[in-house]
Structures are given as C-alpha cells and as structure tokens.
Amino acid sequence: MAGKGEGPAIGIDLGTTYSCVGVWQHDRVEIIANDQGNRTTPSYVGFTDTERLIGDAAKNQVAMNPINTVFDAKRLIGRRFSDPSVQSDIKLWPFKVIPGPGDKPMIVVTYKGEEKQFAAEEISSMVLTKMKEIAEAYLGTTIKNAVVTVPAYFNDSQRQATKDAGVIAGLNVMRIINEPTAAAIAYGLDKKASSAGEKNVLIFDLGGGTFDVSLLTIEEGIFEVKATAGDTHLGGEDFDNRMVNHFVQEFKRKNKKDISGNPRALRRLRTACERAKRTLSSTAQTTIEIDSLYEGIDFYSTITRARFEELNMDLFRKCMEPVEKCLRDAKMDKSSVHDVVLVGGSTRIPKVQQLLQDFFNGKELCKSINPDEAVAYGAAVQAAILSGEGNEKVQDLLLLDVTPLSLGLETAGGGMTVLIPRNTTIPTKKEQVFSTYSDNQPGVLIQVYEGERARTKDNNLLGKFELSGIPPAPRGVPQITVCFDIDANGILNVSAEDKTTGQKNKITITNDKGRLSKEEIERMVQEAEKYKSEDEELKKKVEAKNALENYAYNMRNTIKDDKINSQLSAADKKRIEDAIDEAIKWLDNNQLAEADEFEDKMKELESICNPIIAKMYQGGAGGATMDEDGPSVGGSAGSQTGAGPKIEEVD
C-alpha cells in the first residue's frame, strides 16, 4: 500500500514527443488535463535568459529559441553517444549534444546566460516533474508514487535510466511497465463486458519516436504477453523528417537556397510539416504556407497524401516486420489473432492502418480505445493495483510480461551462451553451471550481454565482473554457478558462486558505461530542487509584478469614473495620478526587478491612494481630518522620493 498522506499513485506515459498522466479515482481512470486544458503535454523543456519552461510553454516558443529547447530525450536515454542512432539524430536536432564521461551523451543549452549540460535523464525528469505537478494540481495533494511506462523493446540500460529520471523528479517509481502491455490493460477493461474465454490480442503501438508490437493472451483478467518485438527508433518524428527533407529540396530547387543550416527556418518548417501530416490523415491534400521562411522568401507549397505515403513507404513497410516476428516468436498464425489494437498517434495514418489490415487479410482493426491515452490509462490501473487503491474490478488483474531480448554471457572463444531467451515471462531466475577454461585458472570474468546474435561482439555488453579466489585445479573441474535474475521491471541481477569455496560475487546490471552513479543522481535531485525553487521565485516575481500593474491601471480607471471623479478634490486627484504615472513608468524601466521590489512599490502606491479613496468614501468633513491625520506617516512620506514603505516596514 502507498503510505497515507502521499496521495494516490499515478500512471505516467513518458513519451518521446508527448506525455500523459492518469489516476484511478471513483472506480475509473481519470486522464488529467494540464493547465492549458490539454490531456497530453509535449515532452519539451525550454531554457531562456530568465526561466525554464516545460510542456506546452516550451513547445510554443521553440521557433524563437530552437537551440535551447530540448525534446526527444527518450531517443537519447540509456544510449551511448557513439550509438549510430544517436549520431543520425544529432544531425537533425537543433540543440547541441556532446560526448560526456563514459561516452554518455550530454545536452548543452544556454540558461540564464550560462552554458549548462544535462543528461537525458535530467531532461526526462523535468517532464516527469511536470506530469507529477499536473496530477497534484488536479488532486490537490502531493504525489510520491508512480508507475512509468517504457517501450517494450527498451533494453536494460534504457529502463534503468528511465527509473533514474523518476528518482531525480522526486518520484518513487513503483514499477516500470511496457507501453503495449499498459495499452492492453486499457483494451482489456474496455472490452471486459463482452469477452468470454481466451483472446489473442496484438497491440500495434506506433508513437512519436518508438514502435512496439506485443502479442498477448487475455483471459479472465490475466494478461499474458506471448511475444514482443519493435524498434526503439521509429515513429512519427521520422515521418516528419522525410517531409521536412522533401520541402528543403523543393525550396532549394525553387529558390536556389539551402535552409538546412538555419535552425529557426527548419523548426518552422517542421512545425508546418507536423500539422500537414495530421491533416493528411483526414484529407487527400493540404497546403503549407510559411511567410518569410528564409531570407525574406515566403514558402507556399502543397503535398498530397499519396506523396506523403511515397516519402515514407519504406518506413511504413518496416512497421510490418516486427508484427511478423512477433507472431513467429509466439508460434501463432495470424488467423488466430482475435483483435488488432491501435495505440499511439501515428496509427492514425491511413496507410499504416491499410498495410496492417491487409497483413491480417482485411480484418477490421480495433479503434475503440484512445490511441493517445491508452498507455497512461493502463499505467494508472497498474498504479492502483500496486498501491491497493483499485476496486475488485482491477485488483484481480494479473500482468505477465516478458523480457524483449535474450540475456547470456560470453564463453570461451567469444560465443554467446543464452541463459534467458527472449520473450521469457518475468520475473524469472535461471541458473547454469560453468567451469574454467585453463588449468589452475585463479578467476573467471563474467561478461553479461543482451541480444540475439551468436557472437557476443555483435550483442550489447551490459556489464562485467570478476569472480576470483578459485583454488588451483585442472581445467573443467571448478564448478561456478551463474544465476540470472530479472525483476518485474525487467532489470537484471547477475551473481556467480564458486561451489567449492563458496566465493560469491554479484552485479546489478546497470550498464556501467552510461549509468548515473548514486552521487550523480543525488546531485541531480538537488539541482532539480534548485531549478524548481528558481521557477517558483520567478512565478512569485511575475505575480507581484502583475499585482502592481493591475492595481495601478485599476486605480487609474477608478478615478476616471465620473461618480468618483466628482468627489475627489483636484489636489487629491493629482496626487493619485502622479503616483500612478510614476509607478507605471517605474514598471516599464524595471521589468526585471525582484518580487520584494514590486511589493514595496505596491505598498508605496497603496499608501498614497488608499487613504484618499477611504477619505472619499467617508465623505464627511469630520471624518476627513481624522483620516488625514491617521495615515499621514505613510501618506506624506510616500509622496516624497518613495521612502514610504521603508517607514511602514519598521513596525
């Protein structure tokens, strides 16, 4: 159970391009809208000279500030800088990415006039913090516990890094769950009334940056994943890129100018392409109109749905490969699939739907769940189950997920010996006995890999450790038991033990290369707190400034009102007008003042205006003299060189 006073547990779909948050409330899931009224929030963080923006505010200013607005952190998280996919992305991103220690990609931005470096985990943690705050604003309580989703095809380091992002955001990540599995819960609860018996369901999840296919068997509230496949680097953004390149070429042809080096022009073009792509899902052609795109040249063009499909045809076809692989792995024929469920915004593309439908021999696709919200919905249900908040409808749901990649270790000659084959249900534990390769070998090096190839050099090294202190013996005699243990988050622990001596060593595979250390995470948590308090400071400042501005303009309108105007003496009226003019002029010149300066100015202005207005309301001459005596300290001082509030503050 979640501790009391922590508020309910929430489910967060941390997406490449958009994120979404849900909570279990009143026996159902509520998907929570942000302060702009949107139920999904852009996974964007913008840095300016004065503030840090997250979500809609960041995405809205991206054209003005492309190099300091970070998005796509999910395409970096848990990857190395030298990863080919990172290298190809860097060519397309307007912000700067450099290699940090241990080949870890670091994002470089200018914030408040100084250069700052952030890891992908930190950017993701800012988005998670935003989602947490959206939920807190709606629920009116603080929130500590969350279930966060990742693509099913995320590997160990990507999962671990996502968990770290949660820690930096001050969340207790109760569980990392796979996006298609979360969507399957949404589907299962949606269909629960009508279904009897076992159902085979294929979840086709094509989002902004990642692609997953999972095949599940759902029966009586048990969700068993049979197989999963996917591409952690394929999604709507790749379709946008194709369209952007298409128009860059067209601009070159028409105007003999290359805009590809201009981040602002590219960003405006990308925004227009994103909009055009969405429009083409419902109409056959659309226009792109961008005024003064580059060197004062207006860009007007049209694109048809057919052309868009042609630009992306290879990518769309690529989406079918994991579907085949998934069915093969599950040893299931496509005719045995009862329902094909669409998840993720990119599944709205008609061509993707058509290819999928053709693959399943014309079968109707299931579109009954909201593709943008299904994942957060499922995560919220899982959060309710784990914290014991759900009702009996969900408490008996059981999720049996699988590990997406085979796990094993390197044996003599660089071969990969698999201990846990891919699509094994997790949590799981496997042991195997190994021995030494040469006589009197004092230790063994255990190197853990994930991947499907026969040679370890073609797979991904997760980590390694040494088991030493083996007593001298001929080769093949010592018995070393190696145990692989995967928890429910899909994160691996490996231990090795020498049977004769009882020597033990173990490692939690947390990708030594890219993994943040405890100290780094601590530091990032503190920095996150610092940024948060800076954001709050700024908010206070803006509120104080607005309060002063409102007061001044309202007062100006008040004294213009005929009823009031007629009751004020000319001298009083002039005093108020002068004070207001002075305050407004001060405001114009001191936009960047601190909150307390705005507050002081406000007090000063009030000390002049309020007594006069109060005197007017009392109206009687007798009252007036009393009144003038009363606040004269503040009043008279206030009119001289702004010393007013200083006197007030003494008491």
Swiss-Prot record:
Molecular-function GO term, any one: ATP-dependent protein folding chaperone
Inducing or repressing factors: By cadmium.
Location of the region described as Disordered in the Swiss-Prot/TrEMBL record: 619-651
Record-linked Pfam families: HSP70
Keywords: ATP-binding, Nucleotide-binding, Stress response
Database matches in SUPFAM superfamilies: Actin-like ATPase domain, Heat shock protein 70kD (HSP70), C-terminal subdomain, Heat shock protein 70kD (HSP70), peptide-binding domain
Family as reported in the entry's similarity comment: Belongs to the heat shock protein 70 family.
Name of the protein in question: Heat shock cognate 70 kDa protein
Gene coding for it: HSP70
